[in-house]
Amino acid sequence: MDMKKLIERINFLYKKSKEEGLTKEEKVEQQKLRREYTDIIKGNVKVQLEGVEKIPTPNRKN
């Protein structure tokens, strides 16, 4: 599932839970989608951090 559809479905289930409640199946789906979303975000952060290089700075005299 692409990120936009994933977020739309998560938001839909959240709004439905506040308005009328969720079935057991929808609660399970909501948990699964939230886990999938956080796993994607964690993976993106990991990739970004792996690409970071420390740049040495010259010693400065004050």
From Swiss-Prot:
SUPFAM superfamilies cross-referenced by the UniProt entry: YnzC-like
Domain of life of the organism encoding this protein: Bacteria
Cross-referenced Pfam families: DUF896 (PF05979)
Entry GO CC: cytoplasm
Keyword Endoplasmic reticulum: no
Keywords: Cytoplasm
Record's keyword annotation contains Cytoplasm: yes
Cysteine disulfide partners in this protein: none
InterPro entries named in the record: DUF896
Compartments where found: Cytoplasm
UniProt record similarity statement: Belongs to the UPF0291 family.
Record protein name field: UPF0291 protein CBO2609/CLC_2481
Species in which this protein is naturally found: Clostridium botulinum (strain Hall / ATCC 3502 / NCTC 13319 / Type A)
